[in-house]
Amino acid sequence: MKPIHLAASLLLCLHLQAADPAALVKEQLPSLVTLYQQLHANPELSMHEVETAAVIARELRAAGLEVTEKFGGHGLVGVLKNGEGPTILVRTDLDALPVKEQTGAPYASTKRVKDDLGRDVDVMHACGHDIHMTSFIGTARVLSRLRDQWKGTLIMIGQPAEERVLGARLMLRAGLFSKFPRPDMALALHCSSDMAHGTVGIVEGYALANVDSVDIVVKGVGGHGSMPHLGKDPIVLASHIVLALQNIVSREVRPGDPAVVTVGSIHGGTKSNIIPDEVRLQLTLRSYKTETRRHLIESIRRIVKAQAESAGMPVEKMPEVIVSDDQSPALYNQPELCTK
């Protein structure tokens, strides 16, 4: 982790003229790096961001914001009113991933917890949310210090459960834009390993894709591994489904139209000599266009059904395709805002 990452991210949220934001960022960097290391070493899974939210709330209050906690799960909202002017929203995510850290960093996470399914999992900030939160707090500190240089209302949002495509929806359902000032513009960032440190990228138009989560329950007829002819093996069927799904993007989606179909989880069986009754697949889908999203989902349903039929599955054993209602739309950056 290089301090310049934090500095570059912080300056993205600042567009001030009379003062020197860079000098304030440099002043704040030592304490921000300490905060980053603390957050990195203590990650929490989606919907369990208790201590993380408490740390961010404490930092926002120290910067002079009025903070509301436990808003939409472990979400939080900080408000700094500074006279008449536009309302600007700055957002960070809070949650981490069930990933084992192997960086060897002195502040590496050693966290291991039970997930919502009761499984023991390692936890790591592997998607940069620790950097996002640190930049977020630095932005709050600097904007608070420079209140004589701007007018308006600053809304700072800590979004829980971003990795599960759930937290933003929970905050909206809780009345985010009816209980707090509605923003004229929203600013956020995402760190990227594709960019050199010390650089900031701004994308006009589509920047981040739709996100859909799809579960597939592949059913079978269990039995003994020595007598597979007496059952219907869902592991074999699930394997055929995973391979067939790879044709959607490569052979059905127009080249140049971004799309992703990834099978990220497959679970089934308990012992080497037992054919299970069921295998579960978990997929993530990404796209920009509504018609592409629709095509991906329809193709998954078609392929799953066809593979099951070719395996001789009876109607009552057809796989279930479950598309989550918590779909996240694509992020579209207004070109006129990007050029300011």
Where are these regions (language model features)?
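Sec-dependent signal peptide recognition
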Residues: 2-9
